[in-house]
């Protein structure tokens, strides 16, 4: 079992070529805007960069990147589950340049199958959160951290929310608890794996979720529908990603968020296709550098202000948005993505067969 901590953990990202070093120099975080010069952007041949992303600010980011670099981006915005299905289905003939989703476990699984470019680390100043999160092979890059799961409730209807995970199993909350489907929602598998890690293993975690189902657990595809079930009165307690939960509170002052002990750290990350052309890999590296530049961080923190913008930064000099609680006030745990990532398919299959259905 991974020790429980009150510090956070993310990861890194994938492989460099000599051409990438030239491109990155023009988009270094040491610049005031994070944008490359027109001369450096024209130094390498441009091809469309295909971005698979489940981030709420991805449209704003890809537009800003294209404006800064002149590189055309084709964005496939979808939930994490369908994006991973596309990648695995086409792994012998891939059609993606980079993947940007929440959950390092997904990237560890891709890395262990040889699908990610290794060895690239952007030229940035990591804070302790970022430094702790870099995988040894540099096969993916952390871009931020959220928490999974936050407990969201209507404080006008629930005076005393559960204080522990075990209290969710009590008759008081029969039919009142909702969460997401891990086959659709990327943040949900790390939550399930985190509970298994906390409780002492897969079988004990399966027993916990089986008891939740017996107690009337309600499953919806993703954060949005789960929160809608809460606000409509179908459920009383929603277990969702912290960014979605805090965003919901910003929009509805009757809602509140609690963090049960412990919550699992959920890094967002970018990984590059190991089989992409060298030109597209170089552009993907420039994209990572742009995301982590001052200009890119402004886009991340403004592109989805009641959703994914509510993250904990991994860079020095970048502060989380004011709506977020101090991370030191929350008891968190880290899970090893290389332990849990390879089990994602098996655990999700079990969950869908035994809990969702």
Region spans (language model):
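Periplasmic-binding protein-like
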Residues: 147, 207-212, 251-274
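A ligand-binding cleft/hinge motif common to bilobed small-molecule-binding domains
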Residues: 105-109, 231, 236-254, 304-305
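Secretory targeting and sorting signals
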Residues: 1-31
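Mature extracytoplasmic/periplasmic domains
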Residues: 273-334
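Extracytoplasmic ligand-binding site segments that recognize negatively charged/polar headgroups
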Residues: 47-57, 78-82, 94-234
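Bacterial lipoprotein signal-peptidase II cleavage site
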Residues: 27-41
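Short, polar/charged alpha-helical segment
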Residues: 50-74, 248
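A bilobed periplasmic-binding-protein/Venus flytrap-type ligand-binding module shared by bacterial periplasmic
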Residues: 150-157, 193-196, 267-280, 299-303
């Amino acid at each position: 079992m991974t020790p429980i901590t009150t510090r956070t953990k993310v990861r890194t990202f994938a492989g460099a070529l000599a051409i990438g070093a030239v491109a990155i120099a023009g988009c270094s975080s040491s610049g005031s805007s994070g944008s490359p010069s027109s001369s450096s952007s024209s130094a390498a041949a441009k091809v469309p960069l295909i971005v698979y992303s489940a981030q709420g600010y991805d449209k704003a980011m890809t537009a800003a990147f294209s404006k800064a670099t002149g590189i055309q981006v084709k964005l496939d915005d979808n939930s994490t589950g369908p994006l991973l299905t596309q990648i695995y289905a086409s792994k012998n003939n891939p059609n993606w340049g980079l993947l940007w989703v929440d959950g390092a476990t997904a990237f560890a699984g891709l890395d262990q199958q040889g699908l990610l470019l290794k060895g690239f680390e952007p030229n940035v100043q990591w804070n302790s959160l970022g430094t702790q999160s870099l995988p040894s092979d540099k096969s993916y890059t952390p871009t931020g951290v959220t928490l999974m799961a936050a407990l969201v409730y209507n404080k006008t209807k629930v005076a005393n929310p559960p204080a522990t995970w075990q209290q969710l199993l009590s008759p008081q909350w029969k039919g009142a608890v909702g969460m997401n489907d891990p086959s659709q929602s990327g943040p949900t598998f790390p939550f399930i794996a985190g509970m298994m890690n906390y409780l002492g293993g897969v079988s004990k975690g399966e027993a916990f979720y089986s008891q939740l189902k017996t107690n009337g657990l309600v499953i919806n595809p993703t954060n949005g529908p789960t929160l809608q079930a809460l606000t409509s009165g179908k459920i009383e307690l929603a277990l969702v990603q912290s960014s979605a939960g805090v965003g919901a509170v910003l929009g509805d002052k009757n809602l509140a968020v609690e963090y049960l002990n412990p919550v699992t750290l959920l890094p967002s990350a970018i990984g590059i296709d190991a089989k992409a052309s060298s030109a597209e890999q170089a552009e993907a590296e420039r994209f990572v550098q742009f995301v982590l530049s001052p200009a890119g961080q402004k886009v991340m923190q403004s592109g989805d202000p009641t959703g994914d913008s509510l993250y904990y930064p991994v860079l020095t000099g970048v502060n989380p948005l004011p709506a977020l609680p101090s991370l030191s006030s929350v008891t968190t745990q880290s899970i090893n993505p290389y332990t849990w990532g390879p089990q994602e398919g098996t655990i999700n299959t079990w969950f869908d067969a035994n809990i969702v259905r």
